[in-house]
């Protein structure tokens, strides 16, 4: 599109060539240029905020409006050729002031205001549009809605005329101003009508021309049809007026330039002097012509959007509502600023969100270092940047959008904050558990007593301090969600629960250690008691200290020993549990479990002693001690005249009485089972299912077990008793037969004639010995030695020593024989053949031994596993 006859509309390229003549805001086809914002950015107006001013110029076509602007503001609007009369400016053009300062020739030179934007509006009354006044009205409405100052360019000789003085255009301006004011009831926007009278000769004073124009303007205002409530309004309620005269540009060029320079000094910030008022009480303007009340309060970065919205309403013949447009602009710009702010916010926060999400996905939340400061800085910068850019817009919309932005930011920061607290919570619990466990193990390794409650209290304090430190570091000031007291309370509660669980675990380990001690003590003591059953001897065969205990009081001794051992264990448990800060209920549960577990240990030990092989062996030993030894504990040497049958019967019957005695756990004093149910006691009210799940049911104590106390105390059933009786009798019968044979063998082994034959054949030797003093003395010494050895019961040790010496001599002889054979080839061959046969025999025997040993090991492993599984 060719504009103004010689240059095209501005594109997207930001360069001086495209913007030499400014930017065409609206073309002659009433299309708005979307590149207005690019031009404002190019001219560095966008960051100015409210520090900019907008001036529009009105006037008839070909009256020198563009020439005036170019001279006054240094712009380069296209001007009409001197050789032809035609339309030059089409649509509405905009350019930034290029003349920053007035000429320096004056002493009171005044700097022009920054960022003055000048709009060159298409002239009125042109032949190109003819009677079509639609664009004239729309452009006037657009200029009035956006501009602070409206420059009316007229010639001096047109003052007093209606069309020539643009009174028709001004009537349009007044009408659209009333439309705007009718919509905007919250404020009273004012504008400045600045009449620049061209070709001013000075013949008619400027004041007279001013009065004429004001009279015409008041007449036009009074002729307007005003909305309800504004019938008595005055033109000065909405407009201020200023006047200036300029000489002819061609006939008085030097004076024209000088007056333009003077006029430019008025385009700066001014103020009203309350001490100087006119007849209507309006304060006079001092300084420049730009008053704050003229400004439309549209930030520079939103002007392009605002202007486009205004023009869209105008061109579509919709009622122009400036407050609504300002709110729409505020919403648009605040959303745009919010998006820009969130981009920078994302760059600062997204890495932390990614790290946190990755750690959570991996199942190992981590406390992120520097998160708190990063969140504070990101939030502060985001809100500050938003305030800087958006606070210039509509206050209500700005506050609403700021609240929305803060909600978006805070929702993400809150998620990070809670994730940080969750990670600190989890890591703190883990570190607390590990620290307490490590401290307990260290105390156990040192072998010294340690105070578990003190360890838990110390580590809990450190854990809470660390959590609070990490929580404070993640706090974002001035946010409600940064209060971490609820999370801290939950963390403290979890620490209490974990501490309680660790205390319960430690008490279980304590109970296990005490239980092992009980197992060891009971194992040794019960072994001694049951081993005493296998010894039926008295006298020299009795125990080393004291008399042989009564077999009838076996269970009394076992029960007393059991109760004393467990009482000692309870004392140890209670003393150690006091350092755990355990409650009375927890100690009661621990003692109750200890008693039940201890009974299980005793029951298992008794069952082990009552195994068929063990009990049968003890019965045989008891019988043999009573049968083979006399009341003094001396072994019996059976002779044919001994009453073996009666001795056998007494010993057998005495031993048989042990079977019913051992079959039931009964106290001799009461002839009743021990009070196990009262001794164990009722289940504590504080006991949990977890405390009971690993306990073995006890008859007479647990009602759900279905067994009575009598059944619980039955150690050998009736069937097993009968089997033991039968097998024991068979064993006793074998011992009796052996004794009987021994007695009979002593008679038949040496016939009587043997002694006569021995005397007859050995008479010479007897006489020789008796006559020879040396032989007689040797015989006497040997006889005395043999007698003494017999009296001291040393024949057995002497025989064993002799056998050991002979075995040692045999082994030494074999070794020397092997050394001799290894020295010759023949011997080596013989040894090789012998070793081959021995290897085969060894393999066969080894397989048998492995089977036998395997069975033993399996039994042993079973017993060991049972011991290891018996925990408290």
From Swiss-Prot:
Residues 1-749, 795-872 are cytoplasmic. Pfam families: RHD3_GTPase, Sey1_3HB. CDD domains: GBP. GO terms for molecular function: GTP binding; GTPase activity. Keywords: Coiled coil, Endoplasmic reticulum, GTP-binding, Hydrolase, Membrane, Nucleotide-binding, Transmembrane, Transmembrane helix. One of its GO terms (cellular component) is endoplasmic reticulum membrane. Its EC number is 3.6.5.-. Residues 690-704 have a biased composition (Acidic residues). Residues 482-504 form a coiled coil. GTP binds at residues 59-66. It is found in: Endoplasmic reticulum membrane. Its main location: endoplasmic reticulum. Residues 771-773 are lumenal. Residues 49-294 form the GB1/RHD3-type G domain. The chain crosses the membrane at residues 750-770, 774-794. InterPro entries: G_GB1_RHD3_dom, P-loop_NTPase, RHD3/Sey1, Sey1/RHD3-like_3HB. GO terms for biological process: endoplasmic reticulum membrane fusion. It is a multi-pass membrane protein. Residues 676-704, 849-872 are annotated as: Disordered. Gene3D superfamilies: P-loop containing nucleotide triphosphate hydrolases. Belongs to the TRAFAC class dynamin-like GTPase superfamily. GB1/RHD3 GTPase family. RHD3 subfamily. Cooperates with the reticulon proteins and tubule-shaping DP1 family proteins to generate and maintain the structure of the tubular endoplasmic reticulum network. Has GTPase activity, which is required for its function in ER organization. This is Protein SEY1. It comes from Paracoccidioides brasiliensis (strain Pb03). The lineage of its organism: Eukaryota, Fungi, Dikarya, Ascomycota, Pezizomycotina. The gene is SEY1.
